[in-house]
Design a protein with these regions (language model features):
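A glycine- and Lys/Arg-enriched "phosphate-lid" helix/loop adjacent to the NTP-binding pocket
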Residues: 48-126
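NTP-dependent small-molecule kinase module
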Residues: 94-170
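ATP-dependent small-molecule kinase phosphotransfer cores
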Residues: 1-72, 76-78
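Short, polar/charged, Gly/Pro-enriched helix-capping and turn/loop motifs at alpha-helix termini
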Residues: 33, 41, 84, 168-169
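Short secondary-structure boundary segments
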Residues: 45, 90, 143
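Short loop/turn elements that form and flank the Walker-type P-loop nucleotide-binding site
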Residues: 36-37, 81-82, 133
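Hydrophobic/aromatic beta-strand patches that form the interior of the parallel beta-sheet core
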Residues: 42, 85-87, 138-140
Length: 170
């Protein structure tokens, strides 16, 4: 919120750069050796998040170029590892809003600028669906109708999908 009140107040490219440099610092300081030794690394909100959250700020006819830019910048120029598998946990914003209201006990003021902006959240979901299709991500549907699936069910579905991707035994 320090750069504006709305996600669109900061350009997709500037925001992506901030997050990419933060990822670079994390990689070089904390997990580069593990990665290079062959460890399985699970990351929440890796470079693919830049694609989803920042691309949603752009006109649709610029999405392919933005995906290429993020991938070139992060993987080629910064030297960050490219993910072998990306999982997108899909949930309609209407369902996530219900969960947030519960988390914050109905106090809408506790939501951050992104959580408050349902137009932005819908745009992010649209950009995520596009990126998932274009980049071959695994998609796990985390809602049934107007309700979130139980975490245990999401976990089972995720493990089943991942079993084929990374040779897990479930």
């Amino acid at each position: 919120g320090k750069f504006g009140e709305n996600p669109e107040d900061v350009s997709a490219y500037a925001s992506s750069s901030f997050y990419a440099v933060d990822r670079f610092a994390s990689y070089t300081q904390f997990w580069k050796e593990d990665y290079q030794s062959g460890a399985v690394i699970v990351a929440d909100r890796y470079s693919t998040s830049n694609i989803v959250f920042q691309m949603s700020k752009l006109p649709r006819d610029e999405w392919d170029a933005f995906i290429q830019w993020v991938q070139d910048y992060e993987y080629n120029k910064l030297g960050l590892p490219q993910p072998d598998c990306t999982v997108y946990l899909d949930m309609p914003p209407s369902v996530s809003q219900k969960l947030l209201s519960g988390r914050y006990h109905g106090d809408e003021r506790k939501k951050d600028i992104h959580e408050r902006n349902t137009v932005y959240l819908r745009a992010c979901r649209e950009s995520a669906a596009y990126a998932a299709k274009m980049l071959g991500w695994l998609v796990i549907n985390c809602a049934e109708g107007d309700n979130a699936k139980p975490m245990e069910q999401i976990h089972r579905e995720l493990m089943k999908e991942l079993a084929g991707e990374i040779n897990l035994y479930v």
